[in-house]
From Swiss-Prot:
The gene is SAUR19. Interacts with and inhibits PP2C-D subfamily of type 2C phosphatases such as PP2C67/PP2C-D1, PP2C64/PP2C-D5 and PP2C46/PP2C-D6. Provide a mechanistic link between auxin and plasma membrane H(+)-ATPases (PM H(+)-ATPases, e.g. AHA1 and AHA2), and triggers PM H(+)-ATPases activity by promoting phosphorylation of their C-terminal autoinhibitory domain as a result of PP2C-D subfamily of type 2C phosphatases inhibition, thus leading to the acidification of the apoplast and the facilitation of solutes and water uptake to drive cell expansion. Prevents the apical hook maintenance of etiolated seedlings. Functions as positive effectors of cell expansion through modulation of auxin transport. This is Auxin-responsive protein SAUR19. The keyword Membrane applies. It comes from Arabidopsis thaliana.
Amino acid sequence: MAFVRSLLGAKKILSRSTAAGSAAPKGFLAVYVGESQKKRYLVPLSYLSQPSFQALLSKSEEEFGFAHPMGGLTIPCPEDTFINVTSRLQ
């Protein structure tokens, strides 16, 4: 039951943007997540200081360096892994 609550909470904080080219609102960062098909998520800037989110960023740096194919920050992990990590950051 706790997992379901954390997943529902993650959906409140993690906003999936429907307009891929739209600017992120103040206080949020747009990231592209997925292995083959990328989905755009908006995450709070406060996540940048969290060690588990930094681990995802390190994975991104290893794979892409600073040249991201989507034009924004791309995190190369399965979407469910991303949601699992970020749901714990609330």
